[in-house]
A protein has these predicted regions:
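N-terminal signal-anchor module of multipass membrane proteins
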Residues: 2-123, 381
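Loop-to-transmembrane alpha-helix initiation sites
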Residues: 36-46, 215-219, 241, 263-271, ...
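C-terminal ends of transmembrane helices
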Residues: 54-71, 114-127, 162-178, 225-235, ...
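Cytoplasmic-side transmembrane-helix entry/capping segments in multi-pass membrane proteins
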Residues: 72-81, 128-138, 155-158, 178-189, ...
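Membrane-interface helix-loop-helix junctions at boundaries between adjacent transmembrane segments
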Residues: 124-213
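Internal active-site segments that recognize and position negatively charged phosphoryl groups
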Residues: 188, 196-249, 253, 257
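Internal/C-terminal transmembrane anchor helices
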Residues: 358-384
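Short helix-capping/linker turns of helical repeat alpha-solenoids
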Residues: 403-405, 416, 422-424, 430, ...
Length: 487
């Protein structure tokens, strides 16, 4: 396909385009949801003011030097397919956690800000700007993992700006061409995550709510699996996702065999981590080129998530950062990983040696077939899915009785949470566990307790008839509930 022909524009016409997006950002300030929060309003107006000043300075400079600016329109499949996948997750997630829908205008505000910022940055450094869907996957990706609460939303604009600045300014030679080093969404996520950790200000964000509410959705694992398939077919990233998932799952199995409890407590792979394995670190532009390198890349992401979970937990820090902090370091390591993958020591392990005559699309299909089989097996044995036993109290009560590592402290935390939601039984159980240090025999939960204590890590139980509650309790392993005839 021939390269797109750029349209030549005068500075006034060219720089009118980012100004239109800036005015679109100002328009969000007229929404009632924004006007009712002065700090949010000033965040939006402040971001717009900075863009207006930059636009004016760039226009005057271009007029003074007689520059002719150019505009290319390139619609890259990588961008719009990824954006469609991310948008699907956002739409499905918002149905079960309304904060996503309530924040739709803020996601849109970030998007128009991103277009204006990217245009101004591009034309500040060169004469040609390429317009396409590029900002969509960056903004959607950031908002799948971290966003600031309205009172601190100016930090969200700074996070977006950092992502586009890093993509433009920090580059290296890759396969004979200049390319960005860092993924423009994962880099600002990592930097701001580190800043929030160091300042102890994680409560300025929805980070913990994001990580937990993404599991409220029914069949979320299979949803992410299906959403990831088009990108895996077209861009050959299956080996990264598959190796990351399998590595983390195998570690979880070994940990359970050694301790009798689950490493991530309520899952083998938390849903937010599973999301990161599909839609965060798999950017083909910032990942290894070799097939073995991509397998190693995925394994390192999975193992680094495990290590970060331990380090953050032992430091008393929020563990939802475990999927975010490592990605820039992995991006920096891709040339080393490719060099290692091409070495004689690992040549025998290179999957590219299998079926060397396969064209890329058929090779992608082969990887996807293997991944589909593995995912089906993991789902069948509750390696992923909605029914992991680590969600349910009966497992942790028995684990605490058996004095398995970390079981009693975790059980106490869960009971405290359920007590805070209104379960008197959980309050009583938690009090006894705190006093005695072990699970004691007590009265069974009542029907008033069941809607609270049966939800596990999922969203609220909607249907609360006695028959349904006893059926759920039986499925979770509560004693004397199977075959119970409610009064």
């Amino acid at each position: 396909m021939p390269p797109p022909e750029a349209t030549r524009l005068s500075p006034h016409r060219a720089l009118g385009l980012p100004l239109v997006f800036t005015l679109g950002l100002v328009a969000f300030g007229f929404l009632d949801a924004v006007r009712q929060n002065p700090r949010l309003l000033w965040s939006i107006l402040g971001a717009a003011a900075a863009l207006v000043v930059w636009n004016a300075v760039l226009t005057l400079s271009a007029l003074r030097t007689g520059r002719t600016l150019k505009l290319e329109i390139v619609l890259r499949k990588q961008h719009y397919l990824q954006a469609c996948a991310q948008a699907s997750v956002l739409l499905y997630w918002g149905w079960y956690w309304r904060e996503v829908y309530d924040s739709a205008h803020l996601i849109a505000a970030q998007l128009v800000f991103a277009y204006a910022f990217d245009m101004l940055l591009g034309w500040s450094r060169r004469d040609t700007y390429t317009l396409g869907f590029g900002p969509f996957p960056v903004i959607f990706s950031i908002n799948l993992f971290l966003w600031f609460k309205p009172d601190w939303f100016y930090l969200q604009f700074l996070m977006v700006a950092l992502g586009f600045a890093v993509k433009e300014l920090i580059r290296w030679d890759k396969d004979g061409r200049r390319a960005h080093i860092f993924n423009p969404s994962s880099f600002p996520l990592a930097v701001f995550s580190l800043g929030l950790i160091l300042t102890g200000k994680s409560d300025l964000t929805w980070g913990q709510d994001i990580a937990s509410t993404q599991f409220y959705l029914p069949h979320m694992y299979v949803t992410l699996f299906l959403i990831g398939l088009p990108g895996q077919f077209f861009f050959g990233v299956t080996s990264m996702t598959m190796s990351a998932v399998v590595t983390t799952y195998v570690f979880g199995l070994l940990y359970f065999a050694a301790t009798g409890v689950y490493f991530f407590y309520d899952s083998y792979i938390p849903i937010a981590v599973f999301l990161g394995m599909h839609l965060l670190f798999t950017d083909p532009s910032t990942s290894p080129r070799t097939e073995l390198g991509r397998v190693i890349f995925g394994m390192l992401y999975g193992l680094s998530t495990v290590v970060l979970y331990v380090l953050l937990g032992r430091a008393g820090l929020p563990t939802f950062y475990d999927k975010l902090l490592q990605v820039p370091l992995l991006n920096l390591s891709i040339t080393l990983i490719d060099r290692l993958a091409r070495s004689s020591a690992l040549r025998a392990l290179d999957p590219a040696a299998l079926g060397p005559s396969l064209v890329p699309r058929r090779r992608n299909l082969a990887y996807m077939s293997i991944w589909t089989i593995l995912f089906a097996v993991m789902s069948a044995v509750q390696g992923v899915g909605d029914s992991h036993p680590g969600q349910w109290l009966p497992f942790w009560r028995q684990a605490c009785k058996d004095e398995r590592p970390y079981a009693c402290p975790y059980l106490e935390d869960v009971l405290s949470s359920f007590c805070g939601r209104g379960s008197r039984w959980a309050c009583n159980e938690g009090g006894m566990l705190d006093r005695v240090g072990a699970v004691e025999s007590s009265a069974p939960p009542t029907l008033d307790d069941y809607p609270i204590i049966l939800r596990g890590s999922k969203g609220p139980i909607v249907e609360r008839t006695p028959a349904v509650l006893y059926a759920v309790a039986c499925r979770e392993g509560w004693p004397d509930t199977c075959g119970h005839a409610p009064d």
